[in-house]
């Protein structure tokens, strides 16, 4: 944790969830309506098909709602894409950009992610920008170089703590059950903080840095207690309210 920075736990449902999944969303909102919700912020990033219904479900609740990607244009001939303005109209407050699955499956570059981030800001969305190295890059001892390049290329100059959140997700840990050591997480987050302060000054010191990659109730306390880890981007464990809330509960004792 970073003193003075309010923690955030964000859930990424990925390509999961249909109408019946809103029951889990209601349970998450109910669990965070108690004193627990005063200890942290929470956001759930659902598939685009659920956004409007999820917004209705979360009306009046403290839980934020996010999309999982957005185009850099406001409209046009981009079949299958969704603009930041569309996400905003559907009820989103946040959007994930640059997730490794987008970088890999759709060959998204840092330059493209930078353009998407600026577009998200223009629409009034908070951008959750993801960075992280592959297994081969870590084995070659290039993890920090890769993270640095992604931060440099994916972030526009207008970054503030209000419009941007950074999520470090080592690619090899996503959905595998594997997690880096506490020492590795600490080193990555310390490096990111250093790079952000060097570029953005005091603004970089106040950005929220999330850890993602096989975060679950059993390892949340260990990971979320690391210096400069200001929350988590949770994948599979966010699909079940009990698991997501158990991760949030970690902040009662940190």
From Swiss-Prot:
Pathway: Carbohydrate biosynthesis; gluconeogenesis; Carbohydrate degradation; glycolysis; D-glyceraldehyde 3-phosphate from glycerone phosphate: step 1/1
GO terms, molecular function: triose-phosphate isomerase activity
Catalytic reaction equation(s): D-glyceraldehyde 3-phosphate = dihydroxyacetone phosphate
SUPFAM superfamilies: Triosephosphate isomerase (TIM)
Active-site residue numbers: 99, 169
Stretches assigned to coiled coil: none
Class in the EC hierarchy, top level: isomerase
Keywords: Cytoplasm, Gluconeogenesis, Glycolysis, Isomerase
UniProt record, GO biological process: gluconeogenesis; glyceraldehyde-3-phosphate biosynthetic process; glycerol catabolic process; glycolytic process
Keyword Coiled coil listed: no
Major localization class: cytoplasm
Source species, domain of life: Bacteria
Binding site for substrate: 12-14, 175, 214, 235-236
Compartment annotation: Cytoplasm
EC identifiers of the protein: 5.3.1.1
Family of this protein: Belongs to the triosephosphate isomerase family.
Subunit structure, as described in the record: Homodimer.
Purpose of the protein: Involved in the gluconeogenesis. Catalyzes stereospecifically the conversion of dihydroxyacetone phosphate (DHAP) to D-glyceraldehyde-3-phosphate (G3P).
Protein name: Triosephosphate isomerase
